[in-house]
């Protein structure tokens, strides 16, 4: 039998959908909860406030922070673990190798399936966020698409890394452990070294900020994105000389997120 030249196989795709059904169903439910949360927020905030529309936009952008860090860290690792389980058992690997499907096709089909399972619910959620915001008079198409973009960049980072770990480790129980360890290696090592210096070097403050500490934080994507690397920033406007009002909310840290992805 001749091998297929295509980079995508429908039979492998359907099998991957069935294997990962619990994962992408839970993920889809989470994404659908975001528009409901926004709707609840909009109903709870008075539309008479001066910054009502700004608060809607800021709330939508706030979803991008988790969607670009903690969510893809968990989802990417879990999807890679399920999609590439055939690498973990010799019998399963031999079975797939005997199929009339090129190895490139097998790998790319599973990889593209993972990207699709993240992109489809994320895009649906972003469109619903746009619809909810528009229902309350806010033009939030751009912020909603920014949430989608941030989600995909974060997922591309963690899913690709998890796939690499699967290919290198090739052991079912060890893969999640190695995945977590490698994601937090720099931060843990820097913390240990700082603690040792604090213990044995006289006058060394434990909380001293250093270049190495900042590097370790940015080299740990989950923590780096959560702790200021990717954040919502707003400007403040003076009104009537008495108080300040937020305006022009935006996401900062796109270069850091793009560099990681």
Task: Give the label of every model feature segment.
Residues 1-28:
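Aromatic- and glycine-rich beta-strand/loop motifs that create alpha-glucan
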Residues 97-104:
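Short helix-to-coil transition segments within interhelical loops
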Residues 15, 19, 105, 109-118, ...:
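Start (N-cap) of specific transmembrane helices in multi-pass transporter permeases
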Residues 18-46, 67-78, 181-189:
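Hydrophobic alpha-helical transmembrane segments of multi-pass membrane transport/permease proteins
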Residues 41-62, 185-261:
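Terminal transmembrane helical anchor/hairpin motif
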Residues 63-92, 103, 111, 118:
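Long, hydrophobic alpha-helical segments
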Residues 75-78, 154-160, 257-260:
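Hydrophobic cores of alpha-helical transmembrane segments in multi-pass inner/ER membrane proteins
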Residues 57-68, 113-179, 184-203:
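Secretory targeting signals
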């Amino acid at each position: 039998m001749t091998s297929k030249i295509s980079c995508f196989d429908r039979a492998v795709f359907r099998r991957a959908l069935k294997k990962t059904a619990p994962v992408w169903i839970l993920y889809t439910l989470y994404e659908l909860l975001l528009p409901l949360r926004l709707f609840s927020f909009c109903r709870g905030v008075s539309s008479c406030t001066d910054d009502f529309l700004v608060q809607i936009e800021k709330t939508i952008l706030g979803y991008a922070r988790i969607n670009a860090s903690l969510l893809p860290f968990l989802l990417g690792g879990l999807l890679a673990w399920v999609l590439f389980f055939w690498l973990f058992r010799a019998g399963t690997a031999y079975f797939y190798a005997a199929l009339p499907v090129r190895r490139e096709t097998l790998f790319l089909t599973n990889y593209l399936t993972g990207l699709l399972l993240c992109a489809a619910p994320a895009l649906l959620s972003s469109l619903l966020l746009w619809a909810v915001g528009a229902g309350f008079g806010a033009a939030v198409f751009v912020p909603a698409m920014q949430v989608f973009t941030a989600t995909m960049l974060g997922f591309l980072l963690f899913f690709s890394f998890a796939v690499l770990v699967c290919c290198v480790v090739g052991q079912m129980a060890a893969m999640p452990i190695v995945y977590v360890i490698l994601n937090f290696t720099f931060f843990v090592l820097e913390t240990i070294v700082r603690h040792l210096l604090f213990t044995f070097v006289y006058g060394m403050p434990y909380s001293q900020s250093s270049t190495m500490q900042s590097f370790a934080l940015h080299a740990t994507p989950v923590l780096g994105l959560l702790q200021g690397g990717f954040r919502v920033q707003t400007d403040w406007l003076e009104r009537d000389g008495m108080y300040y009002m937020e305006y022009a909310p935006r996401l900062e840290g796109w270069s850091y997120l793009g560099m990681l992805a």
